Amino acid sequence: VQIVVETGGSEPQSRLQHQLATMLSSVPRENILVFSDMEEDVGATHIHDGLADISMQERKDYPEFSLYDELQLYQQLGKDTRKLEGGWKLAKYKNMAIKQKIWKMLREANNALPRRKWYVFIDTDTFVEWDNLLSLLESLDPRKNQYIGSPVWANPKAPFAHGGSAIVLSYSALESLNVPEYEGPMPSQFGVNTTALCCGDEALAMALKKRGIGLKGYWPMFNGETPSTVGFGSEIWCEPVLSLHHISGVAMEDLWQWIEDWKA
């Protein structure tokens, strides 16, 4: 399994630091990739710029990329990029650009990134219970086009997986998304007009649908709630928790420690 964490240059580094120190602490570092909208290092963790490969010509089509340029300038001048606002507007373009970047890294002869059966995409405030997630993935076939998560029904004809609850792609689905290489307009977005959509999660679902890959929903196991807002009741009482959202800082530490103590 390859864990792919998405963060941003205007996002507090403490969120990633807490995640690395808790729920990601048991994951081998070679199984963790972190992407942002600028390249930097957080401790021993290297963060890749997920937008770096988007051409200057294509960037002109996306008004939000003025923030990307500002982030790079702040970094070059040694200024605090965390003081910039609006990172969520730029984030929608990272979703699919990251999938292309990973595929490129897998294809590079001199790159040590190994092929994995599964790719799990999370935010820095996503909490994942690894034992439960791995149990689910062991029952599924990574050789098939698998697109898994918690459905958002903004468009009844094309539900998309909620990114904050974690999105899982099989290697086969990642390959189908990237092969054959898309060469039309908006290439970093696989031809999807991401600007007109709510988020990169929706754009990803549209790109996958064009390739005949639909979402397999696993709500409430993939869940966008916190422990205090989950709607406990008879319909979900015996469902295992795979993920939760909006958990960071002390809350991330407390939940992780509680689970570790319970397992012990």
Could you describe each region identified by the protein language model?
Residues E11-Q13, E40-G43, F127-E129, N155-P159, ...:
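Eukaryotic short linear interaction motifs
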Residues H18-I32:
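Short, acidic, metal-binding catalytic loop of nucleotide-sugar glycosyltransferases
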Residues T195-A264:
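C-terminal catalytic/acceptor-binding lobe
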Residues D37-R116:
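Active-site-proximal specificity loops/subdomain of glycosyltransferases
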Residues E108, K117-W118, T126-M206, K210, ...:
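Conserved catalytic core of nucleotide-sugar-dependent glycosyltransferases
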Residues V1-S14:
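N-proximal low-complexity "stem/linker" segments adjacent to membrane-targeting elements
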Residues E11-L16, E40-G43, A91-I98, E129-L133, ...:
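Alpha-helical interaction elements in eukaryotic regulators
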